[in-house]
């Protein structure tokens, strides 16, 4: 499993200051994707224990508000390693986790391992990027089919809880 970039002070992908990692590898290959180089699973650097520890240390910084997981595709990675990472974030960093995926929330719920990972994620931007639905006014996402989901509220209620008012 590889990552393309790790940022300690990211202000682009969510409000505030975020520790962000972009994982390598995506099978969706959405036309118009902003991060095509991350489609290649071999691109970037090995996500080993040293890289994981560095990312965790970024999150422990008092100026960092949350942890962001992007790609590539987070859920095309070694799911055991992703689960270990989100568990460590919740135990050691104790900050919200935001993730982006080309899967829909419903698709993730169909897979037991992906569903377990969701129990540690606070906010999910779901859905494949669709170039024809691209909207530069949207916050946190690129096309209007993508949703910003309150994962914990959705899991508790059994209904998808959308976070509204996300226009620039």
Which ranges hold each PLM region?
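N-terminal [4Fe-4S]-dependent radical SAM core
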Residues: 1-22, 27, 35-41, 160-161, ...
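Flexible, glycine-rich phosphate/dinucleotide-binding loops
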Residues: 12, 106, 133, 157
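P-loop/Walker A phosphate-binding loop and immediately adjacent motor/lid segment at beta-alpha junctions
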Residues: 77-86, 134-168
């Amino acid at each position: 499993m590889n990552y393309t970039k790790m940022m300690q002070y990211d202000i682009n992908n969510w409000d505030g200051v975020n520790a962000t990692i972009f994982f390598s590898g995506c099978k969706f290959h959405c036309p118009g994707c902003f991060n095509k180089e991350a489609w290649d699973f071999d691109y970037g650097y090995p996500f080993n224990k040293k890289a994981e520890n560095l990312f965790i240390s970024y999150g422990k910084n008092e100026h960092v508000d949350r942890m962001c997981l992007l790609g590539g595709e987070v859920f095309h990675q070694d799911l055991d390693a992703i689960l270990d990472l989100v568990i460590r974030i919740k135990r050691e960093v104790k900050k919200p986790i935001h993730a982006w995926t080309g899967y829909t929330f419903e698709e993730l719920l169909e897979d037991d391992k992906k569903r377990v990972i969701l129990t540690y994620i606070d906010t999910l931007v779901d859905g494949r990027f669709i170039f024809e639905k691209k909207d530069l006014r949207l916050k946190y996402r690129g096309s209007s089919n993508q949703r910003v989901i309150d994962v914990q509220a959705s899991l508790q209620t059994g209904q998808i809880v959308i976070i509204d008012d996300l226009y620039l």
